[in-house]
Amino acid sequence: MSDPNANLPVLDTSAGEFKLHEYKLRQEGREWSILHTGTVLTLEAESKIIGERSVRLPYGVALWPSSIALAHEIATREREFVGRTVLELGAGTGLPGIVAATLGATVTQTDRDELALHLCRSNGQRNGVSSIQHRLADWTNWDEPGRYDWVIGADILYGESLHPHLRRIFDSNLAKRGRILLSDPFRSMSLRLMEALEAEVWKVSFDRWDVGEETTPRPIGVFELVPPDNI
């Protein structure tokens, strides 16, 4: 049997060349095609890719289950995204933001990795989306202007030391009546942030998606956060 990824391009990086793979997201009668360096659907795969960071494996452009879950969530909520502005943090392969853009949102994708933004652009073009803005940005030195109806991010809460920086971004870039949509595999540090926000009278709710192989699906929460002034 021929390899369906045989004719896909190779991602050339400072860490070497990485073969790209294709993932197809199907939801609500639509289909999106995303290129990535590999899927990280299980805890075992996650541990492996994190353990190989010493060889500069481009884990940011791998396809993570939280990205798939967030993209599915957005696709099921088309009316809430059409005509809206969206800021995506830690865009990676770009899947959630690309889905939002095809639904009619005006999207700005940010990442601190130029390689990720390169793949975001390529994946946008692959799906017929040319309107997305791409910006290199570091949460610890954030100067992104503008306010957005939605701030979205897939699995961006894994570094607890970065939570204060993310909180400042939420405060500075969320529009009046804006909302935040973050997907996460129920990491302990992420749940602590949710508890802290609830204690500050934020509205916190979530939908659960099971992503991965049928025998061992991984539960992912897509958390919607609304600050007190926007409730």
Question: Residue spans of the language-model regions?
Answer:
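S-adenosylmethionine-dependent methyltransferases
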Residues: 1-231
